[in-house]
């Protein structure tokens, strides 16, 4: 990922998910997120409900909601993540499932 903005009020990242890749199924105690797809098609799981989002579509992820994004397509998926809350630290991640065995 690439950090575009890192302030006291929000953090903005550009995240690329390679074909066949996915992020952890996770949630956060101290922040909410908004994801906006800018390239590709995202398969997004929110509390066990799966939906597909393409270019320009956004999804709001409230604090505490379990979430994951997957790229089931043949082209890279790129989305913008805007974080709001009291902490944007990478330690505020509770991973339920992770392909890389991170805690």
Task: Give the location of each predicted region.
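Short beta-strand segments
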Residues: 23, 49-51, 92
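A generic "binding-loop/recognition-motif" signal
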Residues: 21, 30-31, 49, 65-66, ...
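Short acidic-glycine-tyrosine-enriched beta hairpin
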Residues: 46-67
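Conserved hydrophobic/aromatic beta-strand scaffold that supports enzyme active sites
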Residues: 12-16, 34, 50, 58-60
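A short glycine-rich, His/Asp/Glu-containing loop-to-beta-strand
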Residues: 1-32
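Glycine- and acidic-residue-biased ligand/ion/polar-headgroup-sensing regions
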Residues: 29-48
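A structural signal for the main folded, soluble domain(s) of proteins
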Residues: 4-5, 18, 38-41, 68-70
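Double-stranded beta-helix
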Residues: 68-103
């Amino acid at each position: 990922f690439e950090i575009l903005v890192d302030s006291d009020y929000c953090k903005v990242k550009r995240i690329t998910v390679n074909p066949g890749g996915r992020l952890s199924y996770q949630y956060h105690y101290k922040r909410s997120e908004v994801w906006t797809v800018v390239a590709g098609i995202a398969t997004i799981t929110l509390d066990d409900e799966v939906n597909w989002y393409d270019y320009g579509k956004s999804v709001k992820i409230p604090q505490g909601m379990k979430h994951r994004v997957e790229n089931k397509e043949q082209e890279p998926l790129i989305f913008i993540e805007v974080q709001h809350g009291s902490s944007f630290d990478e330690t505020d991640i509770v991973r339920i499932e992770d392909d890389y065995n991170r805690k």
